């Protein structure tokens, strides 16, 4: 009887450890965006220094970039521990709504007031390349 209880306790412990560990969950960047037609995108930096405005095909290129990101919702890193410049991406929709996205630390992105997601360094650096092409 003691063996059975010991085995059950070990199984419960193993299941608890496996079930409680944070497994990376992949999500698409499109979840960051609201439904609707974007008419303008302003991109600025924190600290201040850069300020761009895009519409038409250039705005679509930024939306395509954001939509195709492969994001991770569970990660070990603490975004608050990463320094560096933050891109502030402000989308203006045809219906008057606005959405602000923060792209920072060369690996994190979040919607204002929303959850933080992790992306690969390669995906994050693609935004800098895209801005260089569009400006």
Language model features: what each stretch is:
Residues 15-19:
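C-terminal motif of bacterial Sec signal peptides marking the signal peptidase cleavage site
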Residues 20-135:
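Function-determining sites in protein domains
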């Amino acid at each position: 009887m003691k063996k059975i209880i010991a085995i059950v306790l070990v199984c419960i412990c193993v299941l608890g450890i496996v079930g409680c560990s944070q497994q990376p969950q992949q999500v698409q960047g499109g979840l960051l965006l609201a439904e609707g037609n974007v008419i303008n995108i302003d991109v600025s930096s924190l600290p201040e220094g850069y300020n761009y405005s895009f519409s038409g095909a250039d705005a679509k290129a930024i939306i395509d970039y954001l939509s195709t990101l492969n994001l991770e919702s569970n990660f070990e890193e603490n975004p608050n521990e990463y320094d560096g410049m933050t891109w502030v991406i402000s989308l203006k929709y045809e219906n008057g709504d606005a959405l602000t996205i923060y792209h920072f630390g060369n690996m994190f992105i979040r919607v204002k007031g929303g959850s933080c997601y992790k992306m690969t360094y390669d995906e994050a650096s693609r935004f800098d390349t895209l801005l260089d092409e569009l400006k």
